[in-house]
Amino acid sequence: MVLSIESMLRTKDDVYQPGLPAKPGEHYGALVRFVEQHAGNSILDLGCGYGAYSLALAARDRQCIGGDINLAYLTKAAASGLPVVSIGPVLPFADGSFDSVILLEVIEHVPQIEAILKEAFRVARRNVLITVPNSENLELLQQNDVTYGHMLSSDHVHFFDPDSLKTLLGRFSNAVEIHRGDPIYPFWFVSRSPAYYGLRVLYRLGLLKTHFYSRLYAVASVREN
């Protein structure tokens, strides 16, 4: 798709392993806050995995349904109390069935990416919310033999920077907002020491600037007919 796997990552079988979905109660708070800020009340969670994010949102009074192609994942999500549906190339919902559709850390794993996006925008009334790993600085990081931890999944088939993600979503939406998030602070070597906390305060105050962001957050509005 956008950036080739070969040009971005070293593919070693003993390092890169398939990623697993978050378990209930182990969701990443920034993703939940992102959805809370932008989503409507009714939400379809595509690629829901074990349902960690839908369950967290349901606890915040959102009406969520989880969809996935993996029946084992859906079984665990349903056992946790999440309404679920097995999905295929065509989603089993009428046009505009949900206020929002979310795909959190999903589309980088999907070979037929445009097909699932077409369906996501079809069943959404308001918007489609997407998060993906940010690939814009991977080559620079690779030169120093490092990468973001969540890039170590062997089942990533697409890699996005802000421009390529906006171009892709622009095929389905006239209003796309892309934000970089989850900054990487270059002081891992002093982790949890007094220096670590002091440097972190300086970054939060804006006195020091970070140049690396590990995730992209996208809000794409549904086109009006």
Q: What are these model-derived regions, one by one?
A:
Residues 24, 71, 110-111, 136:
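A structural helix-start
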Residues 114-129:
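A short glycine-rich, Lys/Arg-flanked "PGG" loop and its adjoining helix->strand segment in the class I
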Residues 104-107, 131:
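Residues lining the SAM
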